[in-house]
């Protein structure tokens, strides 16, 4: 059984820890802060087997150097650091090119790890799928999606469509606790979505109790995330009201997604 644990970092980052059964060697996803990872490993008496990186932003990669140095000093071994080959990330020694390989095998992890190319937030962003656990970095959030810093709306829409096609039960381990903020926007554009309104109550209760709203699931996101359902009649009507100068008579999914993302950027 694969156990997944969150380490809180900075204001709202999650660093995910992957542990197979009772193995003492674990993997971490997007360790932006080495100190919180080392504290966790020490407290749990665990060792670090490797690092999985989704994209190059500093709050996801800032801990690589200190963690690799720690492992080298304490074990004499080089720590395996996986990440997208196309992004300039210092410390990656196991570069991944999704067009050449769509999976990898990790020591101490039973299931193969599927690699998904999900450009949009950054040009070379990748995601990792381990059994039914999706580690998607800053591509898909609960009730939202990442900003387009480097990619195009078309790339992000294709990436989100790829993730939305995964089974309903797929658990979504994104890298930030942005849920309540995203839900405010979702309720603004999708005013009569009963599933969304119910989830707002659930998520608000969780956060009031100091609990995470992550992981979400693909099934839930398809029901409540406006960026996965831009042609919903209510959402299209909201877009028309916001962008009065746009002719949306024959609008397709990409057009509506693009306008939604522009709206969210200034929300």
Swiss-Prot record:
Monomer. Pfam families: HAGH_C, Lactamase_B. HAMAP family: Glyoxalase_2. InterPro entries: Clx_II_MBL, Glyoxalase_II_hydrolase, HAGH_C, Hydroxyacylglutathione_Hdrlase, Metallo-B-lactamas, RibonucZ/Hydroxyglut_hydro. It catalyses: an S-(2-hydroxyacyl)glutathione + H2O = a 2-hydroxy carboxylate + glutathione + H(+). It comes from Shewanella sp. (strain ANA-3). This is Hydroxyacylglutathione hydrolase. GO terms for molecular function: hydroxyacylglutathione hydrolase activity; metal ion binding. Its EC number is 3.1.2.6. Zn(2+) 1 binds at residues 55, 57, 121, 138. Disulfide bonds: none annotated. Its cofactor is Zn(2+). PANTHER family: HYDROXYACYLGLUTATHIONE HYDROLASE, HYDROXYACYLGLUTATHIONE HYDROLASE GLOB. The keyword Metal-binding applies. Keywords: Hydrolase, Metal-binding, Zinc. Zn(2+) 2 binds at residues 59-60, 138, 176. Binds 2 Zn(2+) ions per subunit.
């Amino acid at each position: 059984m694969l156990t997944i644990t969150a380490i809180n970092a900075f204001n709202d980052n999650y660093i995910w820890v992957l542990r197979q059964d009772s193995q003492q060697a674990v993997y971490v996803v997007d360790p932006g802060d080495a100190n919180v990872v080392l504290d966790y490993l020490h407290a749990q008496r665990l060792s670090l087997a490797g690092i999985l990186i989704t994209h190059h932003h500093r709050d996801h990669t800032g801990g690589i150097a200190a963690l690799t140095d720690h492992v080298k000093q304490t074990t004499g071994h080089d720590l395996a650091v996986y990440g997208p080959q196309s992004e300039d990330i210092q410390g990656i020694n196991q570069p991944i090119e999704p067009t050449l390989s769509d999976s990898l095998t990790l020591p101490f992890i039973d299931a193969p790890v599927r690699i998904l190319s999900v450009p949009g937030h950054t040009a070379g962003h990748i995601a990792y799928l381990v059994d039914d656990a999706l580690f998607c970095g800053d591509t898909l959030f609960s009730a939202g999606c990442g900003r387009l810093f480097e990619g195009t709306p078309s790339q992000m829409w294709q990436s989100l469509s790829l993730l939305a096609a995964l089974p309903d039960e797929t658990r979504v381990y994104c890298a930030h606790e942005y849920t309540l903020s995203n839900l405010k926007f979702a309720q603004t554009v999708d005013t009569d979505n009963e599933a969304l309104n119910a989830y707002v109550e659930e998520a608000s209760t969780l956060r009031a109790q100091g609990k995470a709203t992550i992981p979400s699931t693909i099934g839930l996101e398809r029901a409540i995330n406006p960026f996965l359902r831009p042609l919903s009649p209510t959402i299209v009507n909201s877009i028309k009201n916001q962008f009065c100068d746009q002719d949306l008579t024959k609008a397709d999914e990409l057009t509506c997604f693009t306008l939604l993302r522009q709206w969210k950027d200034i929300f």
